[in-house]
Each structure stands twice: as structure tokens, then as C-alpha cells.
Amino acid sequence: MKCPFCGDPNTQVADTRENEGGEVVRRRRRCPKCDKRFTTYERIDLKMPHIVKRNGNRSEFEHDKLAGSMKLALRKRPVTLEALDAAVDRIEAKLLALGEQEVPSEKVGELVMRELKKLDKVAYIRFASVYRNFADVDEFAEVIREVKARPKRNRPAEPPEPTSENDLFRS
């Protein structure tokens, strides 16, 4: 790989590490000509499907846009960045598993709502209110009733205390 500092094409790998899941390989490289070090990342390049918007326009799938919209819904909620990243990964895996070249934006929105409902009910309601474009307060109240009617599974009496500096509510 070419050195980003001096342009020499003969760099050497000094260290190689995989992340926990094995999806990304991190390499520390050294240039023998200028003796500078730099880091590269190697990951599988999967072709995500294009997104077909409601108006018929098509756009490339954007990981950052998906994560950003979910992060906005989760703002000031006690959900860690790790939990958000895992949810985004699950959505991307489901989109890839469809095996389609194009996916309607409605499908992506439904997957996001499903993941947000698992992570945090308030974030789910926030996202649903924008995504479904509620016409009036009654539609909003109906979603709240739906969420409240679901049985609560192993829920602690009080919300958990933040355990990480990465808690989204601190941003």
C-alpha cells in the first residue's frame, strides 16, 4: 500500500488485529522510506440495496443516515452507542438477507421502528410520529396506547443507571 506521507509504494505491515466479530481487520503499517506509521482498515464490501423513496426516486443506502435518524430518536434516552450500533447492524443484515437490489423506504422504516421498539419505547414513539406523519393527536395517542398495552417483560422498577460514557442521553 502506498504511504500517505511520502508516496512510497512499499509499506510494511507492523501489526494486524481483527475486531471481536471478525468483520474488520486493523493494520498498522510503516513506511521504510520516511519511517512514518499509519493505520488501515480492511472490511468486507457488501453491496447494500438501493432505497426506493415514496416519490419513486432511488438513492444509495446510507449507513450514517440510518444511524443518525435512530440516534436522533434515542437522544437523551438511556441507550448506549453499542446498543444503537447493534440495532443498525441487525437492520443492515436484514436488508442484505432480502437479496434484493432495491428496497422501498417503507421497509427500512418498518425495520427501524421494530428495532427502536425493542430498544426504547419513547424513541419508538418519537420515530413513529415523524415516520408515520400523524395527522392529529388521536393517531399519536393510539400509538402510545398500543405501546402501553404490550406486556412488559422483565422490566426493572426504575430505569437503569447509565453505565457508559457512550450513553446517548449525554450528547
Curated annotation (Swiss-Prot):
GO molecular function terms attached to this record: ATP binding; DNA binding; zinc ion binding
The record's free-text note on cofactor binding: Binds 1 zinc ion.
Swiss-Prot/TrEMBL cofactor(s): Zn(2+)
Domain of life of the native organism: Bacteria
Name of one Pfam family that matches: Zn_ribbon_NrdR
Signal peptide range: none
UniProt zinc finger (unnamed) residues: 3-34
Transmembrane segments: none
Region entry Disordered, spans: 148-171
An individual GO BP term: negative regulation of DNA-templated transcription
InterPro entries named in the record: ATP-cone_dom, NrdR-like_N, RNR_NrdR-like
Keyword vocabulary terms for this entry: ATP-binding, DNA-binding, Metal-binding, Nucleotide-binding, Repressor, Transcription, Transcription regulation, Zinc, Zinc-finger
Domain ATP-cone span(s) in chain numbering: 49-139
Entry's family note: Belongs to the NrdR family.
Primary role: Negatively regulates transcription of bacterial ribonucleotide reductase nrd genes and operons by binding to NrdR-boxes.
Protein known as: Transcriptional repressor NrdR
Source organism per UniProt: Aromatoleum aromaticum (strain DSM 19018 / LMG 30748 / EbN1) (Azoarcus sp. (strain EbN1))
